Amino acid sequence: MKLGVVPENLPERLALWLGIPPPGIVESWLGIMASRVVMAATKLNIFESLAAGPLTAAEITTKCATHSRATEQLLNALVGMGCLYVKGEQYALPRKMRAWILADGKYSLRGQILLRYLEWHWWEHCEEYVRTGQPLRLHETLTNEDWDVYQRGMRAGIEFPANWVARKLPLPKTARAMLDIGGGHGFFSVALCRRHPQLHSTILELPQAIRHAAPLLEKERMGDRVRYVEGNALTADLGVSEYDLVFMAAVVHHFDEATNRQLMKRISRSLCPGGIVAIWEPLRQDRKGSIRQLGGLMNLFFGLFSEAGTWSAAEIAEWFRHAGLEPCKPRRMWFGPDLTLHVGRKPA
């Protein structure tokens, strides 16, 4: 997946072929506008107003309690982006958008789009981070309201990757106990437990995260098969030979290498013989010449707001070996920012 400039005629195609303008120039201009347009339309319920059918600009203005001329400008921007289309004097939501953009859509990303407002603010720290190397350490500074937006954003659209992980994870049929470190909204645990009826999961999470994630988990009606335990992954007692599976989704990019190595040792001790640890993470390319757009951006983003950044498959495999675990071949999702499932197995 890559963000780029799409030429609309022959002269534009020729200009791009000649490197006019060079990469990044147009993207930095159009990207900021396009992003804010979708964010505003989501926050102001423009998309929701069209859930029941096409409306005129005046009708949308009335439903959303917005300014008439400014609303029409926003609507036309959305048409230009392909997010809406015009039907006579009315604006309509394309069928392909409904499942993704509406609050009750099957793959709704509404919560994730609203999270962009927090991320917009976080990116203002980019220059300071590059100058000093000091990250934001967001998990230490998020307000109560921010935690709610953050958890809803993390939950939005996670069904596809969670179900993919549940299908691809080589979980032993005898597995009964799972530890989900930093599992937040809990849907990875939900997907795995639904696929493996004998499995029960404990989600180890910070108390401030649980406060806002628990209502999201309750909607899945998993009863006592998926439960929360308050604690910090870096200091909590993980036990000895207690779990058949220890799972972490988008966790290790928060920690530096020394911390991840130490955490992996503690996870190894907590695994039963034959048990597995699974890490689902965006992958950093091993060779600088092979860095792709989204991979490079994600590495900077995670470094900016947390402690470290993304890791390569070779680095994660080395953590496994250092902890006495046998690395399995990583499995990369066909869709997304090089999202990869890394598995290490404890000898039986």
Model-derived regions, located:
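Conserved Class I S-adenosyl-L-methionine-dependent methyltransferase catalytic core
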Residues: 11-16, 20-54, 62-65, 69-176
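Compositionally biased, charge-rich terminal segments
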Residues: 1-15, 285
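Short, hinge-like loop/turn segments at secondary-structure boundaries
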Residues: 219-222, 294-298, 347
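Core SAM-dependent methyltransferase catalytic element
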Residues: 324-348
